[in-house]
């Protein structure tokens, strides 16, 4: 697609044209192509999935979040129309955008829908930690304390802990611990996964790859920064040791069929 993203509803039967709501759902589909291609050794599937995932995530930052406008790069880089005051949008149409969802007016849903299903295929959502801080603050507008623990039932408390962990894992984990296991998990999430996600980000810090500042020559390689400590994480789908090189000069010798983690 010309704009870098797919249409969730492409029939063209609405006055506003086609639309797309949850970019993360599309990113999961295209990221799954990458993982499948790596697992079965089909590079053409990997390449196609990488293109579609990268295009979708770039479109997410430009059209849903106006990241260049957020960074104040100038009027020529601003993708939101004059007078639009929200940090983000949720539904992009062929003719515009809505700060809404199809099913709910709650801010927790309007912003949270860009972060599900929650797994490593949506790590791009947290690649700008400063933006994510403001994103979480807006998403929690309708709570008393600005924390996910105050969300109503079915407002995705666990997904919001996961999103918050991308910018402040300590705060997210503290709020999670104030609730314990006494909450209802989002339909596509599990309590075990939320626990793992929060503790992983507490240990690793902020997602560092994704913006182009730090890259790797393998699609299953990422990195995280916590203070002065950088952690490199590689998953090797093959049966042979693989050497992965990062753009900062770090090389990782990844063991077969599993994770290799180095600092």
Name each model feature, range by range.
Residues 1-11, 34-40, 51-263:
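Ser/Thr/Asn(+Pro)-rich, low-complexity disordered segments
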Residues 8-20:
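Active-site-adjacent structural elements in folded domains
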Residues 21-28:
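Aromatic- and histidine-enriched alpha-helix N-cap/loop-to-helix transition segments
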Residues 43-49:
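Surface-exposed patches in mature extracellular/periplasmic domains of secreted proteins
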């Amino acid at each position: 697609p010309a704009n870098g993203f797919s249409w969730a509803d492409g029939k063209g039967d609405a006055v506003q044209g086609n639309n797309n709501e949850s970019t993360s759902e599309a990113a999961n589909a295209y990221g799954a192509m990458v993982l499948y291609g790596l697992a079965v050794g089909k590079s053409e599937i990997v390449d196609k999935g990488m293109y579609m995932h990268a295009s979708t995530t770039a479109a997410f930052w430009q059209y849903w979040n106006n990241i260049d406008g957020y960074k104040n790069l100038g009027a020529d880089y601003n993708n939101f129309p004059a007078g639009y005051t929200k940090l983000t949008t949720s539904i992009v149409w062929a003719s515009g955008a809505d700060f809404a969802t199809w099913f709910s007016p709650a801010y927790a849903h309007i912003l949270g829908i860009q972060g599900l299903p929650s797994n490593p295929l949506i790590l791009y959502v947290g690649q700008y930690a400063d933006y994510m801080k403001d994103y979480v603050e807006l998403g929690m507008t309708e709570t008393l304390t600005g924390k996910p623990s105050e969300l109503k039932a079915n407002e995705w408390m666990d997904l919001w802990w996961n999103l918050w962990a991308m910018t402040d894992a300590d705060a997210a984990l503290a709020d999670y611990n104030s609730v314990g296991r006494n909450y209802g998990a989002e339909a596509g999430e599990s309590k075990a996964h939320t626990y793992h996600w929060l503790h992983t980000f507490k240990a690793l810090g902020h997602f560092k790859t994704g913006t182009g500042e730090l890259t790797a020559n393998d699609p299953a390689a990422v990195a995280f920064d916590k203070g002065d400590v950088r952690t490199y994480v590689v998953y090797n789908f093959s049966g042979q040791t693989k050497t992965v090189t990062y753009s900062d000069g770090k090389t990782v010798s990844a063991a077969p069929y599993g994770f290799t983690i180095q600092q």
